[in-house]
Amino acid sequence: MAIRKYKPTTPGRRASSVSEFEEITRSTPEKSLLRPLSKTGGRNNYGRITTRHIGGGHKRRYRLIDFRRTDKDGIPAKVAHIEYDPNRTANIALLHYADGEKRYIIAPKGLKQGTIVEAGPNADIKVGNNLPLRNIPTGTTIHAVELKPGAGAKLARSAGASIQLLGKEGKYAILRMPSSEIRRVDIRCRATVGEVGNADQMNIRWGKAGRMRWKGVRPTVRGVVMNPVDHPHGGGEGKTSGGRHPVSPWGHKEGRTRNPNRYSNNMIVRRRRPNKKR
């Protein structure tokens, strides 16, 4: 994926860059795999904001992605097109199965139009094929990994993400996550061979606030510039430091929020690199 940098003709263009979309082979999505996608503005059914910084954005339609592929074991599929998906950072691939059905999957790096892919325990170890972890050789790079057998892919689905299969111990596979965390996953879970494509997406510079608004992202305002009614750091005469340790708008201490006694902790072999905020 190449990135086009603009000449500084305006302040917004000065810092902007966009994808060349060279991998994309079709601009019109498959109509039968589209669903309406309504906007919430970050509100729940009571109309209260439950997620901040969400609102507006370009109208989208959701593309149905097959994250399981279990019911297509042994049925070969041809990659008809590589398409853009506005709902995720990765591109998607449209598969035409031999039985006539069409489905979308996450497009891995190197998957080309016309390639034949397959799912199932007996599938070859090649990019785009989906197999149980017990059938994948140690050291293989994989993506779209399940956390529970049959639940659908949950791990490594965004652009450029990949997981390495380090080994197998009894009924568990040992995986190195994109965060460098090493964890166990049930060996019956399925994964797709290869890494997710469109890795250069992380290098795109949005350049101006308006492009983020097109994506449905609203501004993030610092608490120290708010009024006392809006944030614990708000108020004061002139510019202040907030006057207390950093907290959320609801007064909770800033830092990690993961439950230290989470039920899945026993599946983590080694934590990710400890350079995060505590």
Curated annotation (Swiss-Prot):
Single GO MF descriptor: rRNA binding
Gene Ontology cellular component terms for the protein in this record: large ribosomal subunit
UniProt biased composition (Basic residues): 269-278
Biased composition annotated in UniProt, kind: Basic and acidic residues: 23-33
InterPro entries xrefs: NA-bd_OB-fold, Rib_uL2_dom2, Ribosomal_uL2, Ribosomal_uL2_bac/org-type, Ribosomal_uL2_C, Ribosomal_uL2_CS, Ribosomal_uL2_dom3, Ribosomal_uL2_RNA-bd_dom
Entries under SMART domains matching the protein: Ribosomal_L2, Ribosomal_L2_C
SUPFAM superfamilies hit by this protein: Nucleic acid-binding proteins (SSF50249), Translation proteins SH3-like domain (SSF50104)
Keywords: Ribonucleoprotein, Ribosomal protein, RNA-binding, rRNA-binding
Keyword hit for rRNA-binding: yes
GO process annotations (BP): cytoplasmic translation
Region annotation Disordered: where it falls in the sequence: 1-53, 224-278
Pfam families: Ribosomal_L2, Ribosomal_L2_C
Biased composition range(s): Polar residues: 258-267
Signal peptide (from-to): none
HAMAP family membership: Ribosomal_uL2_B
Recorded family membership: Belongs to the universal ribosomal protein uL2 family.
PANTHER family, per database record: LARGE RIBOSOMAL SUBUNIT PROTEIN UL2M, RIBOSOMAL PROTEIN L2
Role description: One of the primary rRNA binding proteins. Required for association of the 30S and 50S subunits to form the 70S ribosome, for tRNA binding and peptide bond formation. It has been suggested to have peptidyltransferase activity; this is somewhat controversial. Makes several contacts with the 16S rRNA in the 70S ribosome.
Summary of subunit composition and partner proteins: Part of the 50S ribosomal subunit. Forms a bridge to the 30S subunit in the 70S ribosome.
The name this protein goes by in its record: Large ribosomal subunit protein uL2
Organism: Corynebacterium aurimucosum (strain ATCC 700975 / DSM 44827 / CIP 107346 / CN-1) (Corynebacterium nigricans)
